[in-house]
Amino acid sequence: MSFISSKSLEHADREVFSIIEGELKRQTAHLEMIASENFTSPAVMEAMGSVFTNKYAEGYPYKRYYGGCEYADAVEQLAIDRACEIFGCKFANVQPHSGSQANAAVYAALLKAGDKLLGMDLSHGGHLTHGSKPSFSGQNYSSFTYGVEADGRMDYDKILEIAKAVQPKIIVCGASAYAREIDFKKFREIADAVGAFLFADIAHVAGLVAADEHMSPFPHAHVVTTTTHKTLRGPRGGMIMTDDEEIAKKINSAIFPGIQGGPLVHVIAAKAVAFKEILDPSWREYAKQVKANAKVLEVVLTKRGYDLVSGGTDNHLVLVSFLNRDFSGKDADAALERAGITVNKNGVPNDTRSPFITSGIRIGSPALTARGMKEAEFELIANKICDVLDNINDTELHVKINKELEELAKGFVIYNKSTF
């Protein structure tokens, strides 16, 4: 007799099943507008729940340390081939468990402890792993930063000046809260001027890059990382890409045996499924709509008197500043949550409030676009956001708007069950 239970989750663990069902209801009834979140397909989730969960596969395709890896080899190679086709690169490592681990592997491959790293200031829209002091990237390496100017945009001439003064070994370009297109060609010119590697972290805009709705980091960057969720709508994970064979070898060694052991084969299978979806012609339509919907947010919020960092957006998000308001990003986040709209509080350039309070919110369009919402829905939602912000302490209004938006959400349901 097998020791493995054949019960479904609902019958095997009612407590966990109940919690997951609650999350399904939250995702269905609320409007998800956190820029880094998205909805993945049932097929992707089905692959994540497959029997590959049981398989160890240390090493790389056809070079494993375990037996029985023929199917693990096949699915990982498929994911690699599809990733290279999407981004037009020669080499891809699909094993990183997260974007942060992908970034850690790049540093491990190309830097030594104490080497100089130049990345975007976290408070100006960068990411923890781009040299922020609390992060391993700021502790293991000598990190320096560039930021945005008074207009909320990068000044590439200024970044060149900083690079010449710092003389970094690697320059990181990419952001987690920057609403403008990043010019990778100009960054490569800066890197070449100081003899640095150019490392592009495209975690936030990868889905747009895949559809030619944002400049590609190739052929400009020496190495590129991304998450596989966010705008790529895949499983939670990371990926590293390059056109340089020697860098690819170093990256592979940095991932395994450097910072990871066995890859998550079930997640790699899900990445392969997501990559096939991205290769479908409909992906371009999705990415174009993501940008169009973000532009609606820009127009409405600006018309209603709200300040946007950089004045607007070129991608999937807007960053709203409350520096001139008597409420904080935390206040706005909580008020919008009461109204059934999920965003995240976010620091803004020259923020006077703590990172736990902030003076801004980040609003994204990818998740609601995935649900099928277009300009008309986004105009309605943007105005409701402004109504909440205009009446930040009116909880009765927030509850009323919540009910209205819940009715809207009923017309854009993705999932009919919580597990796949």
From Swiss-Prot:
* Localization: Cytoplasm
Identify the EC number(s). Answer: 2.1.2.1
Per the record, the gene is: glyA2
Q: What does the subunit comment say?
A: Homodimer.
Determine if Protein biosynthesis is one of this entry's keywords. no
Record key words, sorted: Amino-acid biosynthesis, Cytoplasm, One-carbon metabolism, Pyridoxal phosphate, Transferase
Protein name per its UniProtKB record: Serine hydroxymethyltransferase 2
Q: Does the keyword Acetylation apply?
A: no
Q: Which cofactor does it need?
A: pyridoxal 5'-phosphate
